[in-house]
Amino acid sequence: MAKQKKHPQGTIALNKKALHDYFVEQKFEAGVALAGWEVKSLRAGKAQLVDSYVLLKDDEAWLMGAHITPLKTASTHVIADPIRTRKLLLHKRELDKLFGAVQQKGYTCVALSLYWKQHLVKCEIALAKGKKDFDKRHVEKERDANREVQRAMRSKGKDD
């Protein structure tokens, strides 16, 4: 028998901007329906989630704005669209929870990361609420204060 190839375990792409712009309330794991050339590109790490979001319509979830750059060696028979909409695969009860929250409570649904789970590509999506500018400044001040405390602790440890 042939030896099984090891698939890379780990993150393909992160959406750091989403963590900066939104308060993440709840996270979900969704499968992604991909074409063959897209999987090859993801193996090469050619993906961006910077301005991506999740559109909920007709009892389905769609990943919008995710950019997967096609490889030069991809198939010439298929015209590769790097920013096409991709279907997200979720359970019915998860979709119902997302629909209810997005329609009533002022939440939005954003993509946080793409990653490998064994040989499958998964997308971590989140139910999130938008941050205001003063919220972002407040988080920045907290980070700076924590950094100062860590510096003080490190320098105190060296003085002993």
UniProtKB/Swiss-Prot annotation:
Entry's transmembrane regions: none
Localization annotation: Cytoplasm
Pfam families: SmpB (PF01668)
GO biological process, one term: trans-translation
One Gene Ontology molecular-function label: RNA binding
Coiled coil: none
Residue segments, region Disordered: 136-160
Keywords tagged on the record: Cytoplasm, RNA-binding
InterPro entries: SmpB, SsrA-bd_prot, SsrA-bd_prot_CS
GO cellular component, one term: cytosol
Family membership noted in the UniProt record: Belongs to the SmpB family.
Classification via NCBIfam families: PRK05422.1, smpB
Role, per record: Required for rescue of stalled ribosomes mediated by trans-translation. Binds to transfer-messenger RNA (tmRNA), required for stable association of tmRNA with ribosomes. tmRNA and SmpB together mimic tRNA shape, replacing the anticodon stem-loop with SmpB. tmRNA is encoded by the ssrA gene; the 2 termini fold to resemble tRNA(Ala) and it encodes a 'tag peptide', a short internal open reading frame. During trans-translation Ala-aminoacylated tmRNA acts like a tRNA, entering the A-site of stalled ribosomes, displacing the stalled mRNA.
Protein name: SsrA-binding protein
